Amino acid sequence: MNSSIMLASGSKIRAELLQNAGIDFTVMLPRVDEVSIKAALLADEATPRDVADALAEIKARKVSDKNPGALVIGCDQVLEHRGTLLSKAATEEEAEQQLRALRNDRHSLLSAVVVCQDGQPIWRHVGVVRLQMRDFSDAYLEGYLERTWPSISESVGSYKLEEEGVRLFSRIEGDYFSVLGLPMLELLGWLTLRGDVQG
């Protein structure tokens, strides 16, 4: 089919993943009030999976409406811990609070990807990863925050697994690409089946 591919995301890591896989694409940032949308979804008792999926679809639709014929990839990732969704930390103090809450406990990352064409969703997937943080010391936590802030403010949970954040964990169950925010294997498989990516 060879439709043009667009990424509706400002995430550097998502763009790098597609680029490293040899995918030809362009980036267009969607203008979406994620905080308000997430709050409305949670008020309607949406599940974490539904929140991630809905936000990914809204982002993809927004860009798709302006780019007829293009395959627009929208993504979102949420972190669920003991029934609560954690957002990106706004301050270093908030990052410390999040990491103290996650320390020596399990949480889940849900990474949604929705592809829209001509304003309509045509494919979707949600990757789920379960992670166990180790019982790291307060001294390590302080040093970690000094070394990684403000970079970790870009990520839910206040860590980047592709960087020093990997040292916070004792166990990870699931797909590495989903941890990074884009379930690549499923997306590439679908694009290949469609003929938009050579297989």
At which residue positions do the language-model features occur?
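Active-site oxyanion/phosphate-handling segment shared across diverse enzymes
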Residues: 124-198
